[in-house]
UniProtKB/Swiss-Prot annotation:
It is an enzyme of class 2 (transferase). The keyword Metal-binding does not apply. Its main location: membrane. Residues 23-288 are extracellular. One of its GO terms (molecular function) is protein serine/threonine kinase activity. This is Probable LRR receptor-like serine/threonine-protein kinase At1g63430. The chain crosses the membrane at residues 289-309. Belongs to the protein kinase superfamily. Ser/Thr protein kinase family. LRR repeats lie at residues 94-116, 118-140, 142-165, 166-178. It is found in: Cell membrane.
């Protein structure tokens, strides 16, 4: 009798602990499954998830409800984590925001995401996800923002998207999605998004949708009437019938239609069967066995607590381990870095609130790296802007980083040339911690997008020559006319933005990498003993990589002429491929982009000559390049031997028909 009583008591206590710990046994377990699916975490952002006794609400990227009983937000963006999306994420049913933007997530989007009925923001953009968009996303009845841009998603849009009547932002650009966005209904005004065998009326979706981007996929058909209020750039780079859009080439569209979409081997059947087996297994257990398991589990838990107490005791008595590159908050307060207050007196300072309004709550992301995010926005006066936001935490910000940030702002503010992006201002705030740069926005996208994602034929030979000379003039200005000189951190076609009339603008969006690298290099100069660290007048200035810029310009010239990227998995490096054409003048025409109908042989020879001179330099050693042509000489060669008459006419008009008329 007594044993039965104790068993019942143990059962009641066990059930009490289980019910009190419902948060831990459900949502925390799902978070741990997500952590297990991440196999690389180079920045150690999830390192504090490993402590079994820590509060999940204190884990990096986890935000809980005010009562701390549910997870309502997961934000681990731009953290370089590699892995899969665990299906168990669908068990965190109180989740309102799932933001995993800018990582290296692979595999498919699990259908279990559709279980998150409270989700308002789903941001999986800029990853390596594949396969179709699961139809279960249509079950996210309260969703307001979906961002799946810049992945490898395939298939057609699921018809169930028509159920999302509160969706106001949809970003699915830069994937490999196919199918039609619209089939006109009987009235001519109803729009339908088609899945494989069904369609759904998205009239409600059209009413709610304020921002959308379908560009650079393989969609066909026409733009839905209810989406005609969106910018035309939201549909460019597809295979649609609208003549006023920049389309993919006919060969790309034809190939896309021939390729059958085979999703990655889905693990759903196996996963589903495993769930059914587990469910059956649980249902078949007798009650006495369940009670025994609870008692055993409690005893194991007690032993774990004793072991944990012992480990904590030993940890508190451990010898101190000093990590040289980490400083505690108390150590950070021991020194101060004095910065010249006059340094930024002539540069406009904008508030975070101003930029938040201009960039629509920082939702319009146009670029991302491990160090920064780039947003597009519009100021009150109507000026379009590109805002670079540094991805760094306040506790990681040092006096040296602050100095380098201000020097970078002052350096960029010096630039004033037709072929360099203009810095409009900066943002610096403490709460929330913010460091941003604000540039004028070139509305025609990057050179890389035009050459490799858009309709390359629209960038005719005349326009390409105009871009070549514009880049050369920009580099000449930066290297030769500025005092002190200025170099682009990573010169590539992604760093060349184009205006409506195809004027190139050199932009240094990768300057953060230089700032962080130089800060770490100088960190050893900070004395932990002294109370003040005064920066010497001779402190190193902006790192000048003139030879690297000129070498990169040579690669750019080949990329512009050929339409090929610097590296392609199937065809290798552009430089290696181009060698045979550069060394044999009679075969030089083989370099030219096949998308071009016309080109000028003399211009081609000039560009190839300059490219060869650039590539013959040593990009790692400025001292070995004294006898090589300077950027001024290279620019003069291009300007004197390439006719600018066509480019001059094109400059007065940004319409494509003007160029076509000149070509004919």
């Amino acid at each position: 009798m007594r044993s039965k009583y104790f068993c019942s008591l143990a059962l009641v206590l066990g059930l009490f602990f289980v019910s009190c710990d419902g948060f831990a046994s459900n949502e925390v377990q799902a978070l741990r499954r997500f952590k297990e699916a991440i196999y690389e975490d180079p920045l150690l952002v999830m390192s504090n998830w490993n402590d079994p006794n820590s509060d999940p609400c204190d884990w990096t990227g986890i935000y809980c409800s005010p009562s701390k009983d549910h997870v309502i937000k997961i934000n681990i963006s731009a953290s370089s984590i590699k892995g899969f999306l665990a299906p168990e994420l669908g068990q965190i049913t109180y989740l309102q925001e799932l933001i995993l933007h800018g990582n290296i997530l692979i595999g498919t989007i699990p259908k279990e995401i559709g279980n998150l009925k409270n989700l308002k923001i789903l941001d999986l953009g800029n990853n390596h996800l594949m396969g179709p968009i699961p139809a279960e996303i249509g079950s996210l009845s309260g969703i307001m923002i979906i961002n799946l841009q810049s992945n490898g998603l395939t298939g057609k849009l699921p018809a169930e998207l028509g159920n999302l009547k509160y969706l106001r932002e949809l970003h699915i650009d830069r994937n490999r999605l196919q199918g039609s966005l619209l089939v006109a209904g009987a009235s001519g005004y109803q729009s339908k998004v088609y899945s494989s065998n069904s369609s759904a009326n998205i009239a409600g979706l059209c009413k709610s949708l304020k921002v959308a981007d379908f560009s650079y996929n393989f969609f066909v058909g026409n733009i839905p009437k209810c989406l005609e209020n969106l910018p035309r750039t939201s549909f460019q780079g597809n295979c649609m019938q609208n003549k006023d859009l920049k389309h993919r080439s006919s060969s790309q569209c034809a190939n896309a239609q021939l390729v059958k979409t085979h999703g990655s081997p889905s693990a759903a059947p196996k996963h589903q069967s495993a769930q059914m087996v587990a469910k059956h297994h649980r249902a078949s257990k007798p009650k006495w066995l369940l009670a025994l398991e609870i008692v055993t589990g409690s005893m194991v838990g007690l032993l774990l607590l004793v072991a944990l107490f012992s480990a904590v005791h030993r940890w508190n008595n451990r010898s101190t381990l000093i990590i040289p590159w980490k400083k505690s908050s108390s150590e950070k307060e021991k020194f101060t870095v004095y910065v010249d207050s006059e340094m930024l007196k002539d540069v406009s300072r904008l508030t975070r609130q101003e930029l938040e309004v201009a960039c629509e709550d920082f939702s319009n992301i146009i670029g991302l790296s491990a160090d920064s995010q780039i947003y597009k926005g519009t100021l009150k006066g109507g000026s379009e802007i590109a805002v670079i936001s540094l991805c760094v935490k306040e506790e990681d910000w040092t006096g040296y980083l602050e100095l380098y940030f201000q020097r970078e702002v002052a350096d960029l503010a010096r630039l004033n040339h037709e072929n360099t992006a203009k810095l409009l201002g900066y943002c610096k705030e403490i709460s929330p911690f913010t460091r941003m740069l604000v540039f004028e926005y070139a509305s025609n996208g990057t050179l890389y997008e035009h050459l490799h994602y858009g309709e390359a034929a629209l960038v005719s030979w005349a326009r390409r020559m105009k871009i070549v000379i514009g880049i050369a003039r920009g580099l000449k200005y930066l290297h030769m006319e500025l005092d002190p000189p200025f170099t682009i951190s990573e010169l590539s076609s992604n760093a060349i933005y184009l205006t409506e009339d195809f004027t190139p603008k050199l932009v240094d969006f990768e300057c953060w990498k230089t700032i962080l690298a130089r800060s770490e290099k100088n960190l050893r100069n900070i004395s932990s003993q002294g109370s003040i660290c005064v920066l010497p007048n001779g402190m190193e200035s902006r790192y000048l990589d003139v030879s690297g810029n000129i070498y990169a310009f040579g690669i750019l010239l080949l990329e512009i002429v050929s339409g090929r990227p610097p590296y392609c998995k199937d065809k290798g490096f552009l430089i290696e491929w181009a060698k045979e054409f550069l060394e044999a003048p009679e075969a030089m025409s083989g370099l030219v982009d096949p998308e071009l109908k016309h080109f000028n042989q003399e211009d081609l020879e000039t560009v190839c000559e300059v490219a060869s001179q650039c590539l013959n330099r040593d990009p790692t050693n400025n001292n070995n390049n004294h006898n090589k042509p300077s950027v001024q000489e290279l620019c003069e060669t291009l300007e004197s031997r390439i006719s600018l008459s066509i480019s001059a006419e094109l400059r007065s008009s940004s319409l494509a028909w003007a160029e076509l008329a000149l070509d004919s």
